[in-house]
């Protein structure tokens, strides 16, 4: 008899206490991952247990081992046995330029700080030149995550929580979930090549429309929803068959020139009766892509940097693509200023706490979209198995039994608390730097302990006056 631990969720299987060997299980009882994900944590004289179902290509368990210190060994083993590319959930865990390497300068005498409790403006306008700008009470909102990747309960809780903070909820690329939209304070509809939920009514009852060109974890690829997540309700929204994989094209077939994109923006602006129209791009060819976007005359542009997450993306792409968010934002702000553009700039990709957001505001962003942070507030425990459909907490799943585990009322309140705390803390960052609005935060408030950040942004190094 031995004791094992699931490397995904940490569940313990003590064979003696449970009364049967690990090999008799089909999957982890908590996260539903295969028992090959268990590792032995107590040595016994007994022969190590192995999975009852093995491939002829599996490595001999008497010699196979895991060693995170050997670059890509486990990934190569998995690809070699399965014959398929690896898909992974959430964001990269590789070393990244960190928001924690940027520090704020607290005001003392020149300038002086504000007093505790002094009023600070957090109101945020997206698309100020649009006929019907979107007005939020905070510069933070919940980013695009689809119904399909997430459960109905999770999407609705996120929307209700965003409404508690008087900020926006985004649809994601899976079309509009009516319960989510009804709960929203402000709603941003994502317009994708598959045209899910594109009707005159949906365009005129959303508060902004965002054309999705790409996302940070899989730039140049369309979204993918595995068939096991395509329930009758999701199939109806997307106009697809139940149980079949859903793949979005990697690009709009009707966009082949700047003029084509401009026509799309103008058409959506007309159909939506003047709602702000945005364009979302992954951070890659930043300046060239921004020039293309500006020619289309959008009301806002969203840039998705390296460090962001998704329910499932090709592991090899996630680990090898996209400009890190700090550098992407710096380059975008510089380019837009050089062009004299006043388009609203939104950033997403790895920002979670108020200090991240305050620093992004100081670098010149108008608003920040958060995804992983909001999911954590709702209940996500980072099992990182979103694509499996077996999320133990009922968030990234369509399994009816798993969905019951998410208390929607509690999740909504937690999301609301999270967003409201972020907003209050942003006010504090404004006060300690002597600013009456969070949108007055600027580069003069920043310094960095990273020479790379100092060399490739305008943030000064802490060792220099």
Predicted ranges, named:
Residues 7-8, 29-30, 390:
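Short, cysteine/histidine-rich loop/knuckle motifs that typically chelate Zn2+
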Residues 33-34, 41-140, 144, 149-160, ...:
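Conserved, well-structured core domains of diverse proteins
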Residues 17-26:
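Short linker/helix segments within small regulatory modules
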Residues 15-16, 37-38:
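Short, non-ligating residues that shape and space the ligands of small metal-coordination modules
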């Amino acid at each position: 008899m031995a004791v094992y631990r699931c490397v995904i969720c940490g569940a313990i299987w003590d064979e003696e206490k449970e009364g049967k060997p690990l090999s008799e299980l089909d999957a982890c009882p908590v996260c539903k991952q295969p028992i090959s994900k268990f590792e032995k944590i107590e040595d016994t004289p007994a022969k190590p247990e192995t999975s009852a179902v093995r491939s002829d290509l599996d490595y001999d368990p008497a010699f196979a081992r895991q060693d995170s210190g050997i670059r890509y060994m486990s990934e190569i083993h998995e690809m070699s046995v399965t014959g398929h590319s690896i898909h992974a959930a959430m964001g990269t865990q590789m070393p990244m330029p960190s928001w924690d390497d940027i520090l704020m300068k607290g005001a003392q005498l020149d300038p002086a700080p504000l007093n505790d409790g002094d009023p600070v403006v957090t109101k945020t306008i997206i698309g100020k030149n649009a006929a019907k700008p979107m007005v939020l009470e905070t510069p933070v909102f919940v980013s695009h995550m689809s119904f399909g990747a997430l459960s109905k309960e999770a999407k609705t809780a996120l929307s209700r929580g965003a409404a508690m903070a008087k900020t926006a909820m985004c649809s994601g690329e899976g079309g509009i979930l009516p319960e989510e939209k009804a709960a929203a304070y402000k709603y941003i509809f994502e317009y994708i090549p598959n045209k899910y939920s594109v009707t005159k009514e949906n365009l005129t009852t959303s508060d902004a429309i965002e054309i999705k060109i790409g996302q940070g974890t899989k730039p140049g690829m369309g979204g993918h929803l595995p068939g096991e997540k395509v329930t009758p309700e999701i199939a109806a929204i997307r106009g697809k068959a139940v149980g079949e994989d859903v793949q979005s094209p990697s690009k709009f077939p009707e966009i082949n020139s700047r003029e084509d994109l401009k026509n799309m923006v103008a058409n959506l602006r007309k159909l939506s009766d003047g709602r702000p129209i945005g364009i979302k791009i992954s951070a890659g060819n930043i300046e060239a892509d921004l020039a293309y976007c500006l020619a289309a005359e959008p009301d806002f542009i969203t840039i998705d940097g390296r460090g962001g997450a998704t329910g499932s993306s090709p592991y090899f792409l996630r680990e090898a693509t996209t400009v890190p968010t700090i550098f992407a934002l710096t380059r975008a702000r510089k380019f837009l200023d050089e062009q004299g553009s006043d388009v609203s700039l939104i950033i997403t990709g790895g920002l979670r706490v108020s200090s991240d957001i305050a620093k992004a505001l100081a670098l010149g962003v108008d608003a920040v979209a958060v995804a992983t942070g909001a999911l954590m507030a709702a209940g996500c425990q980072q099992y990182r198995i979103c694509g499996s459909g077996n999320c133990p907490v009922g968030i990234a799943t369509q399994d009816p039994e798993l969905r019951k585990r998410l208390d929607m009322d509690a999740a909504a309140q937690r999301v609301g608390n999270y967003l409201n705390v972020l907003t209050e803390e942003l006010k504090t960052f404004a006060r300690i730097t002597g600013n009456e609005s969070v949108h007055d935060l600027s580069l003069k408030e920043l310094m960095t302990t990273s020479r790379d950040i100092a060399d490739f942004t305008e943030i000064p190094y802490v060792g220099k006056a």
